[in-house]
Amino acid sequence: MSKKLIKSGMIVSGMTLASRVMGLVRDVVIANLLGAGVAADVFFFANRIPNFLRRLFAEGAFNQAFVPVMTEYKKNGDEGEVRELLAAVAGTLGGIVTVVTLLGVLGSGVLTALFGWGWFWDWLHGGPAAEKFELASLMLKITFPYLWFITFTAMAGAILNTFGRFAVSSFTPVFLNITMIAAAWWIAPLMDKPEISLAIGVFLGGLVQFLFQYPFLRQINMLVWPKWGWHHPGVVKIRTLMIPALFGVSVSQINLLVNTMLASFLATGAISYLYYSDRLLEFPLGLFAVAISTVILPALAKKHVDADPADFSRTMDWGVRMVMLLGLPAMIGIAVMREPILRVLFMRGEFGLHEVAMSSASLLASTTGLLSLMLIKVLAPGYYARQDTKTPVRIGMMSMAANMVCNLLFIYPLGYVGLALSTACSGTLNAALLFKGLYQQSVYRPSRHTGVFCLKLLVASVLMGGVLAYLSPDLAQWGAWSMGKASVQLTMLLSLGAAVYAVVLLLLGIRPRHLKSGQQ
């Protein structure tokens, strides 16, 4: 694999690491401020919809549809044609999103009723959750305009990525985290309902992200004046690819929205427990899988345009191997150390030992699907780079159906934990079907060394998990320690686990050069 691709991956991972660390700090601040009660449930609900749209546009459908077309124009056209494409895309997309944003703000009550049906039912009948419905409707009015800002932020980031400027778009989410932290520290004390300050932070964070990237577009002479271009050939191609991709890429996020709706029928705290467990999974998912996906999509699109199927398959194989290298130990490590991680990160203020235990249960269920969700981020570009958006949609529909069935099977005996387990099961099915499709089409064939490589990773990960499980005390002991001592103990154990993993890999014969090629 080329040094340029590896270097790009390292840059994106580094910038993403900064963003994810700030995201964890933000969640620590939120846990301290709101805990896992009524206010937390309502804020996480109100933030779920714009957050879903962020995934959809910043890491999903728009990027998957736009980058291959942009790459094609860059290769086959001159700069004027590229700028004309960008103007048409910006104007058309901007017009549509402006209308959607206005409808979302004006219809926040309808959206709240749709995705928070349990709260809406109580509101209609004067039940105990009526206050949640009213507060969620108000907060959604504040957070929904984030969609408008993040749409153009995503477009700017996709343009920069096609020019090899990966660091800017990867670092941009840091500003959302900073503004939300600032809102919690400085605006919340001034308000009767501190959760509203966080909604204001989401709005301001979208604005700051929107403004940050545009000077970099000017540097590459790609800052254009938007104009309506519904019938522009490039726009036609992008929307043809994007409409099915809106569904195909966002299956896991749609499943989370469904889980949120069902959790509104459960006891207070269910939405918060699911949120905190999901946030911990987002760290390895964003740091590793999204970073790898970000750099391989333009590379795959170029290899498809160049008609180089062998190198296309090798690039995909490299992406899968990197996800396995980082995803297997992350999955096992989080599963084993979930309680101490939650304790150290969130147990302060309104978030106590009970909340740690409850969040830990859903985190364990969610972790079973972490590797599959990471693989989806690498396998899906194998379709979108070839401008095939229909196959992921068909697979996504099957995955969503599986999620619904699992929800019905698991929610009664397991409650909110069953919802987390359903998402994990549907994600695993999604990844398996994506791989099967690529293999049957002879688009991606793993190298003969990849199977052995992955088996060695599994052995090293299991041994690492065994060491951590043996050395880690129970939750009561973690809770009895001071924050300082618990943090030191956790850092030492995680460092030891990483060392065990690395040493076992070396003993099994894996060397750094194997990360650049198909060797084992």
Descriptions of predicted regions:
Residues M1-Q520:
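Membrane-embedded alpha-helical bundles of multi-pass transporters/translocases
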